[in-house]
Amino acid sequence: MKRVLVKGIQGYQRFISPLKPPTCRFYPSCSHYGIEAIEKHGAVKGSYLTARRLIRCQPFHPGGLDYVPDTFDWKAPLQREKPESQRDD
């Protein structure tokens, strides 16, 4: 299952993404995040993390650095802590 999901994302990166202007608000891009999440946490958990990321990738979210977490938590909030470059301190 992991292989099918990763190949689907790679197909998007190769054939669809070049036809669109870059719009991802995050680094790494959502498609790279999806591949890493699926490879690191498996098909179900990786897909869940990818879906959460895609929900946040919209004009009303500031974006920024958002790496795949090393540990998985179903209850983790949708909004992670802001990167240091975006803190108001």
UniProtKB/Swiss-Prot annotation:
It is a peripheral membrane protein. It is found in: Cell membrane. This is Putative membrane protein insertion efficiency factor. The keyword Membrane applies. Keywords: Cell membrane, Membrane. The keyword Cell membrane applies. HAMAP family: UPF0161_YidD. Belongs to the UPF0161 family. GO terms for cellular component: plasma membrane. Could be involved in insertion of integral membrane proteins into the membrane. Transmembrane segments: none annotated. It comes from Exiguobacterium sp. (strain ATCC BAA-1283 / AT1b).
